[in-house]
């Protein structure tokens, strides 16, 4: 892995080396921030397009091959083959889809159809592409900024200011009372889907303070103890670093008061209910009474990982 990290560093710092990598790397395609997917059996995959395929397709659109330099670096293989992402929003979407035999799919929808390998790359890709689209001018001079070839920064050549892509810290917390876990949903969620509580860190807050505030704000509960679990990049609404935590509330103080400005609903769920939900596919399932069965975020999402950790903790706890 050291060789991979060193190689990626070189690509970000040296446009000449990065240009060579573009001529031998592969590309993930987007159209107005929607990734290109192909259905293979029952799964959806994000195909890697070779530079030869890219040049051939651009030729059919009578586009200059230099358009490839609009791509952004998003990673590389263990063998140091670079991965890039390129948004072709200026070209006719249906023609590209027909040419490459796939579909551009809105990323939120795509997340429920992808495996764990493609999702992080597409997440990083969309976040970077969006950042470049919204930071084309210097906030101080109003003059155009220029990206380096890898897309790891933009420079205002009028005053030398360098802009780097940023992420907003967000805490995502799975609350438990010892025997149940608390899940919630926003009105924008797909029908029946519940997840852990989440919210942005305020300026000046510690991680612990954010967890306590968010739990109090959203469901009216006081956190007794908490601990860090893991982190994950998340491209919505712009680019966030999801900091996953577990939190415990006192079993005697579990009455939920839902903040309707933040959530549509929240509730306590038993281990049995969670186990059933983990066995369902991540998609809406309407029941005979018109309601929707509980289902959870996809396996690679950090909310799902938090829930899986809680299940393991319950299994290892004494009865």
Question: In which residue ranges do the predicted regions lie?
Answer:
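Active-site lining segments that contact anionic ligands and/or coordinate catalytic metals
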Residues: 223-231, 240-244, 263-264
